């Protein structure tokens, strides 16, 4: 069992106890113990996209295509490309590129229902939402924090347009966000 699995299980148990009314005043101390139990892991190589110029061209092409059609769509490969580029250290790619494009895609209803479900789960996968989170300060923060920001846009889009995510999907997200908040030590993660 990984450190993340252990913390996920502990947080779920605490949430269950809280929902049963068995803990309340003790919860902050219990969460503090979870935070104190986190072990720093050795740094490992971080996969960061290095194709900034190509990425910007591709992002602009998708933006242009979406704005020029009355029935916008995005391919699964394009979604994978965009998710991978949330890890970019270049703000022109990550912030003004991928992040803005995802929001445009949500607003244009360019995703299929299946793509929404798949992307929602993908952004919460351990290798995305918790990317290098146990290691010393590193650039994995960009993938973590921007995945969380895209999730917030997805939730809004789902509630106002798509309506395909289930109560179980939302509860799993609450769990993951609670764990993220406990684990994120780097201030850039709360931008």
What are these regions (language model features)?
Residues 2-111:
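N-terminal alpha-helical scaffold/docking segments in eukaryotic complex subunits
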Residues 97-111, 117-125, 133-137:
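N-terminal low-complexity, intrinsically disordered segments
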Residues 107-114, 159-165:
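Short coil/turn connectors between adjacent alpha-helices in alpha-solenoid helical repeat scaffolds
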Residues 119-191:
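Eukaryote-skewed repeat-based solenoidal scaffolds used as protein-protein interaction platforms
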């Amino acid at each position: 069992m990984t450190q993340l699995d252990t913390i996920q299980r502990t947080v779920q148990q605490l949430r269950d106890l809280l929902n049963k009314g068995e803990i309340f005043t003790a919860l902050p101390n219990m969460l503090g113990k979870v935070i104190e139990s986190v072990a720093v892991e050795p740094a490992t190589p971080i996969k960061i996209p290095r194709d900034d110029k190509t990425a910007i061209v591709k992002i602009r092409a998708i933006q242009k295509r979406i704005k020029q059609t009355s029935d916008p769509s995005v391919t699964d490969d394009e979604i994978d490309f965009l998710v991978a580029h949330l890890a970019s250290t270049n703000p022109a790619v990550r912030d003004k590129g991928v992040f803005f494009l995802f929001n445009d895609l949500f607003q244009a209803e360019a995703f299929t229902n299946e793509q929404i479900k798949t992307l929602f789960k993908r952004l919460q996968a351990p290798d995305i939402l918790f990317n290098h989170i146990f290691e010393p300060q590193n650039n994995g923060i960009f993938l973590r924090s921007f995945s969380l920001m895209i999730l917030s846009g997805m939730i809004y889009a789902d509630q106002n347009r798509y309506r395909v995510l289930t109560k179980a999907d939302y509860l799993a997200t609450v769990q993951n966000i609670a764990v993220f908040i406990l684990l994120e030590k780097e201030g850039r993660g709360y931008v």
